[in-house]
Every structure is written in structure tokens, then in C-alpha cells.
A protein has these predicted regions:
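HAD-like aspartate-dependent phosphatase fold
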Residues: 1-122
Length: 122
């Protein structure tokens, strides 16, 4: 992330931040960019149906300079098949975080503004 800006508040350094025009996207995989596949059925992950609008939109954001990180409830043992699927389908991205808590009903608590976007993949 070479676009990070170092900031100071009251003469003390704080965590670096991205410029205002660059966004940090955290994107779910199952049910968001492809079929919703549970961890209990990993054999389906390699052949998941891609949501074409997701590929077009996310790659556009990447090309605009935004950071794309997939944040999935898939477990670490499914990393290789997940990376292969993302790459074979042409997704451009910076990172992949595994092990997001399952079950939905998420509430995000942070010291930064968090915006949510409901992306209808189908």
C-alpha cells in the first residue's frame, strides 16, 4: 500500500491512512461474487458460478486505484482453491482474508467511518 499517508495528531503519529479518493474495499465471496457455498461443501468451490457484474465492478475499482481485499468465511484450508478460483475468473485484488465469523448479522465497530454496500450479484 504505497499510497498510505502518515498522519500526526497533537504532534503524535497515528496509524497511516489512505488518501480521501482511495477506498479500502472488504468484499465477501460466497453469495456476493459467486454462488453461496458453505465450508461443508468445498468440492463446489472450484466450480462456483461467477456473478459477472461483480467481476466487472471489482476490477473497475481495482483499476481506479482502490484496494480490493476479499474477506470470507471460508476456512484457511480452502485458501488454495479460493485463490485459484479468483485468479481463473480474472479477479484483480490485493489480499484475501479467511475465517470471517459465520452467521451474518454483522455489526462493525471501528475508529474509522465504515460504509456498507449491498452488492446484488445475480
Amino acid at each position: 500500500m504505497n499510497k498510505l499517508v502518515n498522519k500526526m495528531i497533537d504532534g503524535e503519529s497515528i496509524s497511516p491512512v489512505l488518501p480521501d479518493d482511495i477506498k479500502n474495499y472488504l468484499i465477501d465471496i460466497d453469495g456476493t461474487i459467486c454462488d453461496d457455498i458453505p465450508n461443508e461443501e468445498p468440492e463446489r468451490m472450484a466450480t462456483a458460478n461467477l456473478y459477472p457484474d461483480a467481476l466487472k465492478t471489482l476490477n473497475k475499482w481495482y483499476d481506479e486505484g482502490h484496494y480490493i481485499t476479499f474477506f470470507t468465511s471460508r476456512v484457511e484450508e480452502h485458501r488454495e482453491i479460493t485463490e485459484k478460483w479468483l485468479n481463473e475468473n480474472g479477479f484483480k485484488y490485493h489480499g484475501l482474508l479467511m475465517g470471517k465469523p459465520r452467521g451474518g448479522n454483522y455489526h462493525w465497530v471501528d475508529n474509522h467511518i465504515v460504509r456498507a454496500t449491498r452488492f446484488d450479484g445475480k
